[in-house]
Amino acid sequence: MSALVLESRALGRKLSDFGQETSYIEGNSDQNAVSLIFSLKEEVGALARVLRLFEENDINLTHIESRPSRLRKDEYEFFTNLDQRSVPALANIIKILRHDIGATVHELSRDKKKDTVPWFPRTIQELDNFANQVLSYGAELDADHPGFKDPVYRARRKQFADIAYNYRHGQPIPRVEYTEEEKKTWGTVFRTLKSLYKTHACYEHNHIFPLLEKYCGFREDNIPQLEEVSQFLQSCTGFRLRPVAGLLSSRDFLGGLAFRVFHCTQYIRHGSKPMYTPEPDICHELLGHVPLFSDRSFAQFSQEIGLASLGAPDEYIEKLATIYWFTVEFGLCKQGDSIKAYGAGLLSSFGELQYCLSDKPKLLPLELEKTAVQEYTITEFQPLYYVAESFNDAKEKVRNFAATIPRPFSVHYDPYTQRIEVLDNTQQLKILADSISSEVEILCSALQKLK
């Protein structure tokens, strides 16, 4: 299941004073805030005129930051958060900024108004803004959870949650000393699943798994450390792990994939039921997801889903999350004359990994228009699975689906700056074209040398 949930709710936030460690506290999230990004020519009094305009129209700024424009050397870009009460005057302000002052303006919003684009992170550091907005926390377990009546387990879960809440991008993921009981639970899951991988898992999973055993400590008697696994992932595909305390909203989780960041749980399931977990745990993340995120083609496919989610309307977020469910979580693929499992929900479930390749479920070809609206169950084995021709084929289908999402721009991930570039003007398109041209020249040169 990963750190993904298909339902948006009021989310809690972690309050932090100047980066110091704190515990999780329920608070008001700024879900309805409106953000403006505008650029101004670098000249005396330019920003003062805009601030005066805001004041005259009773616009209340709650945050402002600036940086030199990466597109135009003679301009500065300003990112501002506006109080929700300023919304009625916003349309007039944007009109004045564009026509009278000559600013380039982009409006971002987390509300559901039709004329605005939902907020999304533009830099990898901005993942800090929502990584703690989980739908459950630490010791808050449902009554049917195997660890609900175990105070020691609940306290342990809170320890893992606090690690995740205090984490910030760029920091090494803290090491965890797992207990002997936790190692025993891991060992049971590891041993049982590994016995099926050669016959049931896809080639990519089986190719990477021995490398994880060699370099990341994947053993029956050892629970790997997330930091070591994250470094291995980065060396393979640029993906990295980020600790999370529980389930994120679909929009936030998919947004992380756009930056090749996988929000990953660090706790382990309750020892009384080692072959069952009602939520994603470290067994699911490391045995199911990590091997595939180490594969270049699959990593790019996963990132395509994340990029498609940025700025998408809520109804398309639900569709993308459903596509994610039937591919990254419960996907099957053709390999030669056989069908193999690549979904993490299958590769981390002994029972369903056997079931999905039996004659019991229904198998359908991956057609995203149908997959995106297919209902599914979260309490029992899936009655049907979608079969991809290949990861590259699935990736192209996601790109085609993304083209149908109603948003007034396209996006591009810059791996050098770890930023999302919004492609909505000719200058940005020219910069991207120049970059692609340079890569094509390298390719052509290499081909010439092979002749």
Swiss-Prot record:
Pathway: Amino-acid degradation; L-phenylalanine degradation; acetoacetate and fumarate from L-phenylalanine: step 1/6
EC number: 1.14.16.1
InterPro entries listed in its UniProt record: ACT-like_dom_sf, ACT_dom, ArAA_hydroxylase, ArAA_hydroxylase_Fe/CU_BS, ArAA_hydroxylase_sf, Aro-AA_hydroxylase_C_sf, Aromatic-AA_hydroxylase_C, Euk_PheOH_cat
Modified sites of kind Phosphoserine: S16
Entry keyword set: Allosteric enzyme, Iron, Metal-binding, Monooxygenase, Oxidoreductase, Phenylalanine catabolism, Phosphoprotein
Function: Catalyzes the hydroxylation of L-phenylalanine to L-tyrosine.
Quaternary organization: Homodimer and homotetramer.
Record family assignment: Belongs to the biopterin-dependent aromatic amino acid hydroxylase family.
Protein's name in the database: Phenylalanine-4-hydroxylase
Gene that produces this protein: PAH
